[in-house]
């Protein structure tokens, strides 16, 4: 599971600044779920090689309603679900009574807590932070979130003790990036015209991704808001006799993993709780299901985003969709409760889908009735198609040919009077497909041309249901920083020339 880090503290200590600093490092979409608790934000971060979910909680001020009551309203569930709590304090303002009250509450929760003194820039940090040791929560870490100073070291120190869970996540990340590192070694002497070179590179990349692709058990996460028919869809897929054992709607804290088999294919259905509307969250029962839904998305191969045809697309649906795309997961859109609608209403729903979801035109859309079972069986065809596209192997030579065709049809733009040169492309990973393009000045390509390349590769490779990630590698000059070694003849000539220059200056 993806680790969860919660940011807590009184107002104006820099929680949101640190949240933005963490999520910006990967340019992640910050998914805002209004109504669960006001001013709560969730985002995905990648710092120091660690992937984790970060929660920005509302400020806690114990002077009005008491620390415990305010904590229960704003941050209790975040603390309960977090693996690590970062307790932010203001180094400039010093220790205040509200900090002491929050610290007392955190000690009672027996949760891993780290005191983080923010705003240490421009002051004697050691002397200003000494008083925070009175909180009794161990060492005090010093950062300046606005400038980013100390943030990487903080995350590395905080998350490293989590051990095997994070090491596994980091190993997956390293596995995805190993192909890029391998390609960097080829960059100076790789000949993409030579079939032997491309075959060797494909073989190296294939070894890196063989294990992940050979995993034939497809994990399907069914996500969406409550009352969209998510549980009914799970019941229809699994059968009633299975639901009695596994289904616990509205009360479970964890996502339920249910193995099943269909037509000889192994699946794991991940049943998740829903993301509720404003004012509909029962804190005593729901147990912060949003985090579990986000973790289920991270763990799945294919995500079924379930939408209620009668209510249309909500902000919660778009927030979940953003997190799915950011996680790089394959996607199938499921519009439920399609039965009983008039043709006019159906046309309106389809028009709204086309308008609001035009940026994910690669995903299949299914109109079903989970209650009556119509259209449910067709979902598995799209699931297998999306998974196959996300894990298909493509050779370097084919990707390079597609890159050339794309450049011939629409040349790269000029940058400072020089045209961007695209040399070759190779696979950089799978699930989602990663295409690495090498060239000169590629970091200066306009976003519009990057989208053009992404769409061209998708159309050429016929990838359905899975996002494509395009990464660009700048071609390094192998002679940069090196001086030519002169021959003896050149040295003698240089010596004569220097003598002539000195003589002419006299």
From Swiss-Prot:
Show the Gene3D superfamilies listed in the entry.
Answer: 3.30.300.20, P-loop containing nucleotide triphosphate hydrolases
Which stretches make up the KH-like domain?
392-476
Task: Select a single GO molecular function from the record's annotations and give it.
Answer: GTP binding
Binding positions for GTP 1? Answer: 9-16, 56-60, 118-121
Instruction: List the keywords (alphabetical).
Output: GTP-binding, Nucleotide-binding, Repeat, Ribosome biogenesis
Checking CDD domains in the record gives: EngA1, EngA2
InterPro entries to which the protein is assigned, alphabetical = AAA+_ATPase, G_ENGA, GTP-bd, GTPase_Der, KH_dom-like, KH_dom-like_a/b, P-loop_NTPase, Small_GTP-bd
List GO BP terms, alphabetically: ribosome biogenesis
Q: Name one Pfam family in it.
A: MMR_HSR1
Q: Does the keyword Cell membrane apply?
A: no
Q: Which residues bind GTP 2?
A: 224-231, 271-275, 336-339
> What range(s) does the EngA-type G domain occupy?
3-166, 218-391
Instruction: State whether it acts alone or in a complex, and with which partners, per the record.
Output: Associates with the 50S ribosomal subunit.
Q: Which family does it belong to?
A: Belongs to the TRAFAC class TrmE-Era-EngA-EngB-Septin-like GTPase superfamily. EngA (Der) GTPase family.
Role played: GTPase that plays an essential role in the late steps of ribosome biogenesis.
Q: Which PANTHER family match?
A: GTPASE DER (PTHR43834:SF6)
Quote the protein name from its UniProt record: GTPase Der
Q: Which gene encodes it?
A: der
